[in-house]
Regions:
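Vicinal oxygen chelate
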Residues: 12-17, 76-117, 122-124
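N-terminal beta-strand motif that seeds the catalytic metal site of vicinal oxygen chelate
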Residues: 1-19, 76, 135-138
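Short glycine-enriched loop/turn motifs at secondary-structure junctions
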Residues: 2-4, 69-73, 113
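Short beta->alpha transition motifs characteristic of CBS
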Residues: 113-114, 120, 131-138
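Core segments of cupin and vicinal oxygen chelate
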Residues: 9-58
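Long, continuous compositionally biased terminal/linker segments
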Residues: 45-88
């Protein structure tokens, strides 16, 4: 069995502004909110031990907005169980007032043109996030 991602921690400029969005997204897709971190951040966990955390930025560049075209994380994507679930999360994001970068649509340039259906949105720091459904390979 190949290695899988165990956890990801994201640096966030304003935890109070970002936490509600991450809570909406992560609980929608099955994560459970864990305990807060001592630094003010927190994490969400899956039953298999995978987790995603947010931590406050520190240091000289703490106020800098995320730039996905600089060194570091370009975007983060989660797998959806269905197209309907992509649409459901999109509706929740719109009601929340999240920044939608690209609404749910087919993106034939990805996945060899085989049914890649996704919504793209941003967190308050401008980090690009994605929720994507791809049909099982046949």
């Amino acid at each position: 069995m190949g290695a899988r991602v165990h956890h990801v921690d994201l640096s966030i400029r304003n935890i109070a502004a970002a936490e509600p969005l991450y809570d909406l997204v992560l609980t929608h897709i099955g994560y459970v909110k864990g305990k807060p971190y001592p630094d003010g951040g927190g994490e969400w966990d899956l039953a298999d031990g995978t987790s995603i955390g947010i931590r406050p930025t520190t240091g000289a560049n703490a106020a800098r907005e995320h730039d996905r075209y600089s060194s570091g994380l370009h975007h983060l994507a989660w797998s959806a169980p269905s197209r309907a679930d992509v649409d459901a999360l999109h509706a929740r994001l719109v009601a929340f007032g999240a920044t939608i970068l690209d609404p749910p649509a087919e993106y034939p340039r990805y996945n060899g043109g085989r049914g890649y259906y996704a919504v793209f949105f941003a967190d308050p720091d401008g980090l690009k996030l994605e929720y994507v459904f791809t049909p099982p390979a046949t």
